[in-house]
């Protein structure tokens, strides 16, 4: 079925045309876009960069260059700190123990799972959660840190297979591990993508879905969407459905359950995976778009949290995903220092060209 699924039938009995449906989706996206872009530079650097980078990759609009540069500065600052202060085995241990302690007092299910799974391998919090993401982002920009070799030596001291194939780690960090195994491959380091996917599927067999808590069901879905997002290098490259057929089949077969059980972030991500594969006319896209459109508070111009809170920073993730789902443009390998030099007219200290 195409995108022209009937939204409603007016009194005349004629269905609303597809073009009108598409217009309402893009109008809903514009409502959120206005809300965020009027106050974008009040957000923390990570949130500002997260939003700006995704919008730049979708549109190539130079108005997002400042937000991208904010992300660039954040990455440089992190890598400067890591190369100067967290490179020896002892430094990694002390840093990681401090990071781990941050999960101890949190009583929510996710934090407890993360603490229990990671307490015996705390270095993961440094390697996977902090270091790899910053190195991969610099790499995407066509850059690297001036101490790149030192940082790579740190990564090479550890076998990432231990984290990526551990069932308890997958239950705690599915989406993050999906990102990290693809980042490792992107950086030309260890390739544990397939062992991770195999372990993920064993950890979350479809037959066990009904036994999963809401948090664990969400973790499974996040892991699946992030396998595709990471493979696309975060909305830079199109995806071939056949390469991840098991994921697309699952989403198609379970979309109604997903709409009932999942948070808006996940629903939007599911729809975007189909857009990355060029499947805009798949019924899953229409269903996710309708669900996300209905979740928007028109007065506030954004999607609130599940508890009804309207916080720009906390809600940035779900709302930028909503914009992308409702008004999808296309994938672009951008920005890079070679192809978009104006974005990188000055580099923050520590970053150099590859």
Task: Identify the residue ranges that each predicted region occupies.
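Eukaryote-skewed repeat-based solenoidal scaffolds used as protein-protein interaction platforms
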Residues: 110-267, 275-278, 286-289, 293
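Amphipathic alpha-helical protein-interaction segments enriched in hydrophobic
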Residues: 261-269, 313-320
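Bacterial N-terminal signal peptides
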Residues: 1-8
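Membrane-interface motif at the C-terminal end of an N-terminal transmembrane signal
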Residues: 9-13
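Terminal, non-catalytic domain-edge segments
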Residues: 14-88, 92-107, 123-142, 149-161, ...
């Amino acid at each position: 079925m195409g995108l022209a699924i009937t939204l409603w039938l007016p009194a005349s009995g004629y269905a609303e045309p597809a073009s009108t449906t598409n217009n309402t989706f893009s109008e809903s996206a514009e409502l959120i876009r206005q809300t965020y872009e009027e106050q974008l530079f009040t957000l923390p650097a990570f949130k500002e960069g997260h939003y700006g980078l995704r919008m730049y990759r979708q549109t190539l609009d130079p108005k997002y260059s400042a937000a991208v540069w904010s992300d660039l500065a954040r990455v440089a600052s992190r890598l400067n700190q890591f190369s100067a202060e967290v490179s020896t085995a002892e430094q990694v241990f002390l840093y990681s123990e401090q990071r781990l302690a941050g999960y101890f007092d949190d009583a929510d299910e996710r934090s407890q799972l993360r603490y229990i799974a990671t307490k015996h391998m705390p270095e993961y919090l440094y390697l996977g959660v902090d270091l790899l993401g910053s190195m991969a982002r610099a790499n995407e920009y066509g850059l690297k840190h001036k101490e790149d070799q030192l940082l790579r030596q740190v990564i090479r001291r550890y076998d990432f297979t231990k984290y990526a194939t551990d069932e308890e780690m997958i239950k705690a960090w599915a989406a993050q591990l999906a990102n990290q195994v693809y980042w490792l491959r992107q950086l030309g380091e260890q390739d544990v993508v397939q062992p991770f996917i195999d372990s993920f599927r064993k950890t979350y067999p479809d037959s066990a879905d009904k036994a999963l808590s809401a948090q664990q069901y969400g973790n499974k879905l996040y892991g699946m969407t992030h396998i595709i997002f990471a493979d696309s290098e975060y909305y830079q490259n199109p995806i071939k459905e056949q390469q991840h057929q098991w994921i697309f089949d699952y989403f198609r077969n379970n979309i109604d359950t997903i709409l009932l059980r999942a948070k808006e972030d996940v629903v939007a991500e599911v729809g975007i995976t189909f857009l990355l594969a060029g499947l805009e006319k798949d019924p899953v896209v229409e269903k996710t778009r309708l669900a996300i459109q209905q979740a928007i508070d028109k007065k506030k111009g954004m999607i609130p949290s599940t508890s009804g809170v309207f916080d720009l920073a906390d809600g940035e993730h779900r709302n930028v995903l909503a914009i992308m789902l409702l008004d999808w443009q296309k994938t672009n390998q951008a920005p890079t220092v070679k192809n978009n030099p104006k974005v990188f007219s000055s580099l923050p200290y520590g970053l150099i060209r590859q």
